[in-house]
Amino acid sequence: MNKKTFYITTPIYYPSAKLHIGNTYTTVAADALARFKRLTGHDVLFLTGTDEHGQKIQRVAEEKGLKPKEYLDNMVDSIKELWKSMNISYDKFIRTTDDYHIESVQKIFKKLYEQGDIYKGEYEGWYCTPCESFWTESQLDDHNCPDCGRPVEKTKEEAYFFKMSKYADRLIKYIEENPHFIQPESRKNEMLNNFLKPGLQDLCISRTSFDWGIPVSFDNKHVIYVWIDALSNYITALGYNSDNQELLEKFWPANVHLVGKDILRFHTIYWPIMLMALGIELPKQVFGHGWLLVDGGKMSKSKGNVVDPVVLVDHFGEDTVRYYLLREIPFGSDGLFNNELFIKKINSDLANDLGNLLSRTVAMVQKYFNGIMPAPIAKEPIDDELINLALDTREKVENNMEKLKIPEVLDEIWTLIGRANKYIDETTPWILAKDEDKKDRLGTVLYNLSETLRIISVLISAFIPKTSERINEQLNVDLTTWDSIASFDGTKAGTKVVKGDALFPRIDVEAKIEELNSLKEKKEKKEIKPIKEEITIDDFDKIDLRVVKVISCEPVKGAKKLLKLKVDLGGEERQVISGIAQYYKPEELVGKSVVLVANLKPAKLRGELSQGMILAAATDDDSKLFTVSIPGELPTGSQVR
């Protein structure tokens, strides 16, 4: 009999920087779903990979003095090492620089062009390099990207466009007729009401301003933009447009595209429209999970709250990280991470609840039965509640996993763990052991605990697989299939248990946090932005830096981030427009001596003339900025050299 298939994907990650705990969350969740489906008898394909083209990759590689592919090869190695350390069981890793993907993408582009869904035009507007997104003037937030808040660049270039509006009504109808296509429900409503129903603009799908990308096969001046290149990985990985489409026929449509909420629009609007144009069935579901908030906010280097999963694995082991992410983050909503919560959860759930249950059970089998598993020959009514809960939990777990309710699954399993610990207190094995006539009853109690642990081990195997293996080793059981936990008899009497190390040693919370903070401080001191390429003294001499005094300062109308300064250059008054309104109130700058790039060519910003630029130092993500100040005794007009 053929197995049911299950195809699950993560986004392909953009390797312009190291992956962080948020990327890890997506991949761990996908891995848990993939492992569970394998456990329940499905033929699974779990796809992940890297999105390797684009202007940002090209720039980052250049900054490091590397060719893009050389830079990418190093990054991909580190990503694969991360997934190995997190025990990620992906079946295929796709890179958009793979030859088969490039060839397939070129064929997709050509097909869409030849059938009239793509046309050539000219793009003029604003571009965000980090997000690889184009924006119209009306969409900008004070000339910053509405998605990430970073500055955008004005661009004008010839481009190919995809006729999105042609398929919009058809997609709206599909979403409304297939309520499970976009999940959670709130995300579906957002896509319909905020993007689709107001109307779609045609989508720019090629670039000419950089060359690190897949060339349009019939127009080499253009490279194919991220939308077709990256999104199509879900079918090119299965052999679409190749001589062997066996995987495509077997696994498509995907059961779940798992993505972060920030890229849900691309996966629920752009991607399905492309599939409609290609005549390909849509994926069954796109699930947009929430963000991982660190200490109440998004991660950023300047805040010092970026969480490196490698550090956590090194200090606590991969299963602690997997457990916290899967249990504590509401699947579909934002969730919190901080070291204190994380360590306390290890101590309470993993060390106290699960670890102690195993340790006490194995220790008592060793102490009272020389390590040989007794037979359950003296049952009592008090056993039924534990046995029934153990058997019922299997069905509850399966039902919740069908609905992608991962935290609820772990809640059910930990309810069983709690009940088993309570059963020890109720049956008091240490008292039974004092009465030789109660030997059979003692053996039954310990068998029930051991069999419950075997069932727990199977139940947790998709979520914390290494821990599951360690439990099986100590119980010395090999019956670990999903079907085997439909009955309460998988542990065999006469088996010799093997006492091992504690699953999760208790951690001194304060000492460990102090250690992690110390490591982070050392790491931050080492990390500095790469120095730009050398210039000569002649190059530097071209820049005329002068001391100026701020005479007046006021906001620029209609621009939240701009200030209009009048400065004294030593007898000459100038007007300067500076993007520092979010860091300084106008009155804080008046009377201050600052440094001006005096020979910068004048330019108009928001209709106001700017005659120079104020020097300032900022963090990498622009969350903090300070002007370069000069002691008041230096006269205005003095040269800075």
Curated annotation (Swiss-Prot):
Question: Which subcellular locations apply to this protein?
Answer: Cytoplasm
Q: Where is this motif: 'HIGH' region?
A: 13-23
Q: Which GO terms describe its molecular function?
A: ATP binding; metal ion binding; methionine-tRNA ligase activity; tRNA binding
Top EC class for this record: ligase
Q: Per the record's keyword annotation, is tRNA-binding included, yes or no?
A: yes
A GO BP entry is: methionyl-tRNA aminoacylation
As recorded in UniProt, its EC number(s) are 6.1.1.10
The protein's predominant localisation is cytoplasm
Q: How is the cofactor bound?
A: Binds 1 zinc ion per subunit.
Q: Where along this sequence does the record place binding of ATP?
A: K301
Q: Which residues belong to any copy of the tRNA-binding domain?
A: 539-641
Q: Which SUPFAM superfamilies match?
A: Anticodon-binding domain of a subclass of class I aminoacyl-tRNA synthetases (SSF47323), Nucleic acid-binding proteins (SSF50249), Nucleotidylyl transferase (SSF52374)
Return the motif ranges for 'KMSKS' region: 298-302
Name the positions where Zn(2+) binds.
C128, C131, C145, C148
What InterPro entries does the entry give?
aa-tRNA-synth_I_CS, Anticodon_Met, Met-tRNA-synth_bsu_C, Met-tRNA_synth, Met-tRNA_synth_2, Methionyl/Leucyl_tRNA_Synth, MetRS_core, NA-bd_OB-fold
Q: Which reaction does it catalyse?
A: tRNA(Met) + L-methionine + ATP = L-methionyl-tRNA(Met) + AMP + diphosphate
**Disulphide-bridged cysteine pairs:** none
In the UniProt record, does the keyword Metal-binding occur? yes
| CDD domains xrefs | Anticodon_Ia_Met (cd07957), MetRS_core (cd00814), tRNA_bind_EcMetRS_like (cd02800)
Q: Which UniProt keywords apply?
A: Aminoacyl-tRNA synthetase, ATP-binding, Cytoplasm, Ligase, Metal-binding, Nucleotide-binding, Protein biosynthesis, RNA-binding, tRNA-binding, Zinc
Cofactor(s) needed, names only, are: Zn(2+)
Q: Which family does it belong to?
A: Belongs to the class-I aminoacyl-tRNA synthetase family. MetG type 2A subfamily.
**What does it do?**
Is required not only for elongation of protein synthesis but also for the initiation of all mRNA translation through initiator tRNA(fMet) aminoacylation.
Give the quaternary structure: Homodimer.
Its recorded name reads Methionine--tRNA ligase
Species? Clostridium tetani (strain Massachusetts / E88)
Q: What is the lineage of its organism?
A: Bacteria, Bacillati, Bacillota, Clostridia, Eubacteriales
